[in-house]
Amino acid sequence: MKVILLERLEGWGGLGDVVDVKDGYARNFLLPRQKALRANGANLKVFEAQRAEIEARNAKAKEAAGKAGEKLDGTQYVLIRQAGESGQLYGSVSGRDVADAVNAEGGKVERSMVVLDKPIKTLGMHEVKIRLHSEVAVTVTLNIARSQDEADRQARGENVIASQFEDERMAAEQAAADLLEGGAGQQASEYTEAQA
């Protein structure tokens, strides 16, 4: 189906472009959300007559998104989640979780604005892109941790999972050394008693 785009759509074109899209995409997404018009003679005339108004409305929306983006860009949000010892989350962090975290801090983000290739399933610092407008995108940082203390350590740049494994390795080495010292001393005393 040929449609006239009413705003810039990534991968499709800019305002006023006539593009050919799949029927379902046009009927279920573009037309109901008023992102496009069917490309026929009547709609082309309507679009050309209202082009200046549509461009002004789009510019105003872009400016508002830009102002909101200045406040959001580079901000950090802490999400406390349960996870295993390897740092694997019990569940995942989705676009809805990101939007909820931003909105809890006073932002205005819908989950459809959050761009995630796949859900986040590990602890740590994660960069997430939020598309506020078709031409305005910002990046926020998610600090996903098991506790606030862990989140603070991660914010300082510490790799919490690696340090946890290092602490466990050192404790195991110390326990092994203690066993060797205790075991060697006991064997020597048993040997001297047997000699006597």
Swiss-Prot record:
Q: Which UniProt keywords apply?
A: Ribonucleoprotein, Ribosomal protein, RNA-binding, rRNA-binding
Q: Which SUPFAM superfamilies match?
A: L9 N-domain-like, Ribosomal protein L9 C-domain
Q: Which residues does the annotated region (Disordered) include? A: 174-196
The source's superkingdom equals Bacteria
GO terms for molecular function, please?
rRNA binding; structural constituent of ribosome
The terms describing its cellular component in GO are:
ribonucleoprotein complex; ribosome
Q: Name one GO biological process term.
A: translation
Composition bias, kind Polar residues: at what positions?
Answer: 186-196
* InterPro entries recorded: Ribosomal_bL9, Ribosomal_bL9/RNase_H1_N, Ribosomal_bL9_bac/chp, Ribosomal_bL9_C, Ribosomal_bL9_C_sf, Ribosomal_bL9_N, Ribosomal_bL9_N_sf
Function, please? Binds to the 23S rRNA.
Q: Which family, according to UniProt?
A: Belongs to the bacterial ribosomal protein bL9 family.
Stored NCBIfam families:
L9 (TIGR00158)
This one is known as Large ribosomal subunit protein bL9
Protein's gene: rplI
